[in-house]
């Protein structure tokens, strides 16, 4: 009966990684907003934290070294999703879960910054 315990611990570790990544990305987005008086647009996405956007709205005071070194992937190898004017807050940053599609339950459930 070791398998259920190990799988439960793995699920917990994956969820903890998502939450840690989301907290880091949310903090970087807040710093971007402080510097530029707005969040990146949905089109600019999280990439605006790594590389200065070249499309409107252009950032006013983008940090030369960016806001994060690189964008993390969720534990299932999928990029985190970003939506300005989110459904849950000013911005939504989230993982689509193990299945990589919106919605789902258990390991397939979306995990977002609204759960922080």
Q: Which functions belong to the PLM regions below?
A:
Residues 8-16, 27-30, 36, 47, ...:
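Short, surface-exposed interaction loops/tails
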Residues 17, 21-26, 30-36, 43, ...:
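Non-catalytic regulatory appendages
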Residues 1-6:
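N-terminal single-pass transmembrane signal-anchor helix
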């Amino acid at each position: 009966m070791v398998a259920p315990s190990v799988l439960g611990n793995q699920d917990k570790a994956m969820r903890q990684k998502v939450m840690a990544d989301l907290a880091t990305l949310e903090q970087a987005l807040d710093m971007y907003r402080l510097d530029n008086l707005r969040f990146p647009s949905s089109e600019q996405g999280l990439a605006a934290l790594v590389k200065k956007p070249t499309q409107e709205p252009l950032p006013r005071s983008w940090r030369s070294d960016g806001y994060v070194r690189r964008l993390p992937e969720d534990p299932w190898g999928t990029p985190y999703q970003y939506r300005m004017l989110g459904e849950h807050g000013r911005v939504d940053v989230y993982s689509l879960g193990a299945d990589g599609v919106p919605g789902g339950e258990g390991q397939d459930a979306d995990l977002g910054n609204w759960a922080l």
